[in-house]
Design a protein with these regions (language model features):
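Long, serine/threonine/proline-rich intrinsically disordered regions in eukaryotic cortical polarity
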Residues: 2, 7-29
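Active-site rim helix/loop that mediates acceptor-substrate recognition in acyltransferases
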Residues: 30-103, 218-267
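GNAT/GCN5-related N-acetyltransferase fold signature
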Residues: 68, 93, 119, 275-277
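Intrinsically disordered, low-complexity domain-flanking/linker segments in eukaryotic proteins
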Residues: 71-84, 142-149, 249-254, 260, ...
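Conserved hydrophobic beta-strand within the GNAT/NAT acetyltransferase core sheet
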Residues: 117-119, 152-158, 338-340
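Glycine-rich acyl-CoA binding loop
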Residues: 124-137, 315-319, 323
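Active-site/acyl-donor-binding loops of N-acyltransferases
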Residues: 157, 163-190, 282-396
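Amide-forming acyltransferase catalytic core, primarily the GNAT-like/NAT-type
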Residues: 176-296
Length: 396
C-alpha cells in the first residue's frame, strides 16, 4: 500500500512540526519498538516508554513529543478511519538544566536533549527526517524558555555517524570512552576500599556535584573558551535508573540495588561514580553487547591527572577501586563490559591498573556527542566551546 501513497517530499511547504495526540504517538512507538526494543518484548517496550514518560525528569512537560505531518492531508491515508494524522517522522526532547559560562559570567539556561529520531521504513527516502530536524532545531530555540532562562544549546547523540545531524547544526564533539571487561576476579593490585552506593545516597551527591561544577566554571580564567554543561541532577540519574530497573525486572526478574560506588569518607576528598546497566539481548544467556555504563565519575577535589594518579596511586587507585566494583556488578548482571565516557587521565590510569591493555577508544559512528549552539558565531562552534562533563548521564 505504501508505495502507492501520494505524499509530498520533505521540502514541501505543507509539512509542519506538531505535537502528536496519544494515538499518533502510539503509532510511532509501535513502529520504532520493532527496531529498538532490544531485550524487551514489543508490549514490554511500550510499557517501558509509558513508565519513562512519568519520571521526575519527564512528567509535567519534561518530555516533549514531536511529529512531522502533512497539513494538506485530511486524514491518515494508511488508516483513514482512525481520526489520526499520519506521522511522517518523529522525535522526543527532554528538558534539561544547563550551565553556560561565557565572558566571565555563569548563567543558568534551559537545554534539551533530543532522542528517538525516527522515520518508518515505508516513509524513508523522502527527506522527512531531514525536515524534522531542521524544524526541531528552530523550535527548541524558544521551547519552554522564559525571561530568566533562555535556550543557548541543545544536544543529541548520533548513532548514524557525524555528518547527518551536522547538516542541521548539531556539530560532533569529541566522543571517546574506555572499556573494561566484566570480571568477578579480585584485582591483583592493592586498592582503597570502595563502598556501594544506593538510590538513597544519590540526591545529596548530585547536589554536591552541581555545586562543584558551578565552582569549576566560575573559576575559569578570563579569556577562556565559552563552556557549557548539562547538570547531572538526581532527576536525570533517576530516569536512567528507572530505565534500568524496568528492563532488569522484565528480563531478569529483579532490579539492581547497587547504583554506584564511593572511595573515601571526607567530603571534598572523595571519589565516586554511579552507573547503569543496559541489556540488548532477548536471550538472557547472551551477554555480547550488554554494557555497564558509568554515568558520571566525580573526583571531589578535582586533582585529575596528578602524578600519583599516573603512577597508580592517589586518584588512579581510587578510580581503579570504583571500576573493579563496577566490573563485579557487570559480571553479576550479565553485561559484557564497563564503559567510561570522556575519560580523564586519572580514569585511564585507574583502568590500566586493572587492565594494562585499556586504552581510549574514539567513537566515529555511534553515540557521537553533538551540540547545536544558538548564539551567533563564526566557524565551527565545536572549536569555540568546551563541553564540560560530557559523560553518559547526558545521553537520552
Amino acid at each position: 500500500m505504501s508505495s502507492t501513497i501520494d505524499l509530498p517530499k520533505g521540502d514541501s511547504p505543507t509539512l509542519a512540526l506538531v505535537h502528536p495526540t496519544e494515538e499518533e504517538q502510539l503509532i510511532q512507538s509501535k513502529l520504532n519498538g520493532a527496531e529498538w526494543r532490544g531485550a524487551l518484548s514489543h508490549s514490554a517496550y511500550l510499557r517501558r516508554e509509558a513508565t519513562l514518560s512519568q519520571q521526575a525528569l519527564t512528567k509535567e512537560g519534561g518530555i516533549t513529543y514531536w511529529i512531522l505531518v502533512d497539513t494538506a492531508l485530511k486524514n491518515n491515508p494508511l488508516d483513514p478511519n482512525s481520526g489520526t494524522r499520519l506521522p511522517l517522522a518523529s522525535c522526543e526532547t527532554y528538558r534539561k538544566k544547563a550551565l553556560v559560562w561565557r565572558d566571565g559570567k555563569l548563567q543558568e539556561a534551559v537545554s534539551h536533549g533530543i532522542g528517538s529520531v525516527f522515520c518508518g521504513q515505508h516513509l524513508r527516502k523522502r527527506g522527512y527526517a531531514q525536515r524534522l530536524m531542521a524544524e526541531v532545531g528552530k523550535a527548541l530555540r524558544t521551547h519552554q524558555t522564559d525571561e530568566k532562562r533562555e535556550c543557548l544549546f541543545t544536544v543529541l547523540y548520533s548513532d548514524i555517524g557525524k555528518k547527518f545531524y551536522a547538516n542541521f547544526g548539531w556539530e560532533p564533539f569529541p566522543s571517546s570512552h574506555i572499556a573494561l571487561p566484566a570480571s568477578a576476579t579480585t584485582p591483583a593490585a592493592s586498592l582503597p576500599t570502595a563502598r556501594p552506593l544506593y538510590a538513597e545516597d544519590l540526591p545529596e551527591l548530585c547536589r554536591l556535584d552541581e555545586a562543584l561544577i558551578r565552582k569549576s566554571l566560575e573559576s575559569r580564567p578570563q579569556g577562556s573558551k565559552t563552556a557549557v554543561a548539562l547538570v547531572p541532577d538526581v532527576e536525570t540519574v533517576q530516569w536512567h535508573h528507572a530505565r534500568e530497573e524496568f528492563v532488569g525486572q522484565e528480563v531478569h526478574g529483579k532490579v539492581p540495588k547497587i547504583k554506584g560506588a564511593i572511595v573515601g569518607d571526607e567530603v571534598g576528598k572523595r571519589v565516586w561514580c554511579y552507573w547503569t546497566r543496559v541489556w540488548y539481548n532477548e536471550d538472557v544467556s547472551i551477554v555480547k553487547g550488554n554494557t555497564m555504563h558509568i554515568l558520571r565519575l566525580v573526583v571531589e577535589d578535582d586533582a585529575l591527572g596528578s602524578e600519583d594518579a599516573q603512577e597508580g596511586g592517589g586518584h588512579g587507585a581510587a578510580i581503579a577501586a570504583l571500576l573493579a566494583m563496577a566490573q563485579r556488578e557487570a559480571e553479576e548482571w550479565k553485561t559484557e563490559h564497563v564503559e567510561v565516557w570522556s575519560p580523564s587521565a586519572a580514569a585511564l590510569a585507574g583502568a590500566q591498573i586493572l587492565d594494562k591493555s585499556a586504552r581510549v577508544i574514539e567513537r566515529d559512528s555511534e553515540s557521537i556527542a553533538s551540540l547545536l549552539w544558538y548564539p551567533e558565531h563564526e566557524g565551527r562552534a565545536a572549536d569555540q566551546l568546551d563541553w564540560i562533563s560530557n559523560e553518559k548521564y547526558s545521553w537520552c
